[in-house]
Amino acid sequence: MRVYEYGSGGSTLFFASRVARVTSTEHEPLWYSRVQTKLQAKSVTNANLQLVECDLSQTPDFENSPYVQSLRDTEADVILIDGLEDQSKYNLRPLCFALAETQIKQGGIIILDDSWRYTHLRQKNSAVRVQVFESPGPARPGVTSTDVYFY
């Protein structure tokens, strides 16, 4: 199984111990360095962490940015959208979701973290089924949600 992630971190380590290949695209250089150090410390060899910096002030054309488009060259069974949160006045994850829907193969899944911010995507998608998982937020007060879209 192959996983593609917008964003990197704990999920990169989680998937790397469970699947054949993880490709993670990270936009923040400092975070990229921290995750890369953690992967090396744990001797992870099946994760490809790539740094693709982006200018979030130019968001109106963000869907054509190298960050979003990095998914185009990757085959994945699972696509995780978990990056660029609270980084811009624009909703960036829905742009990543739109491209992910064109790239996901039949039988694949898209995971959208912090989906409580993007509930409109639960009705506007081409998934066969959507499962919503709610739980107390580990890093914020209140309940958070993660949506899993099955194709």
Q: Which residues make up each language-model segment?
A:
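Redox-cofactor binding/interface segments in oxidoreductases and associated redox assembly factors
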Residues: 5, 80-81
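Short, flexible/disordered intra-domain loops and linkers
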Residues: 58-65, 86-92
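A short acidic, Gly/Pro-enriched loop at the edge of an enzyme's catalytic core
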Residues: 69-78
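C-terminal substrate-binding/active-site "lid" region of AdoMet-derived donor-dependent transferases
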Residues: 78, 84-151
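Short, surface-exposed amphipathic charged segments that create phosphate/polyanion-binding patches used
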Residues: 60-68, 144-150
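SAM cofactor-binding core of SAM-dependent methyltransferases
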Residues: 1-58
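A short acidic, often aromatic-flanked loop/helix-cap motif at beta-alpha or helix-coil junctions
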Residues: 54-62, 136-141
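Short amphipathic alpha-helical segments and helix-helix/interface helices
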Residues: 12-16, 32, 36, 68, ...
